[in-house]
Amino acid sequence: MIQSFTRLAVADNSGAKELMCIKVLGGSKRRYATVGDVIVASVKKALPNGKVKKGQVVKAVIVRTKKEIHRDNGSLIRFDENAAVILDNKREPIGTRIFGPVGREVRYGGFMKIVSLAPEVL
């Protein structure tokens, strides 16, 4: 469950290392985001030679959350960290590599490029 002011790790090679959620997209009163949801975030830590800079406002999709995700088959899954992948205006990832596993719910959101780049889909 990601909400405003939540800090997230970045799971791609766009140059950013840490994001802070500004807003959860998808409704005027929407408070929480989970795996597969898009957020607006600010870059808090970045590499000096990366594609994104510190302070830049970006859109990102959540790929991992510490809060467990309940699946339709009765199972649940949780990850060790909250992580996101930075998107461009066409909802494609800025980076060319994805680090770590991603949740299967990312596929249902239409982010097939992220699913194909990910080393593991859980």
Swiss-Prot record:
InterPro entries: Ribosomal_uL14 (IPR000218), Ribosomal_uL14_bac-type (IPR005745), Ribosomal_uL14_CS (IPR019972), Ribosomal_uL14_sf (IPR036853). SMART domains: Ribosomal_L14. It holds the Pfam family Ribosomal_L14. GO terms for molecular function: large ribosomal subunit rRNA binding; structural constituent of ribosome. Keywords: Ribonucleoprotein, Ribosomal protein, RNA-binding, rRNA-binding. The keyword Ribonucleoprotein applies. GO terms for cellular component: cytosolic large ribosomal subunit. GO terms for biological process: translation. Belongs to the universal ribosomal protein uL14 family. Binds to 23S rRNA. Forms part of two intersubunit bridges in the 70S ribosome. Part of the 50S ribosomal subunit. Forms a cluster with proteins L3 and L19. In the 70S ribosome, L14 and L19 interact and together make contacts with the 16S rRNA in bridges B5 and B8. This is Large ribosomal subunit protein uL14. It comes from Campylobacter jejuni subsp. jejuni serotype O:2 (strain ATCC 700819 / NCTC 11168).
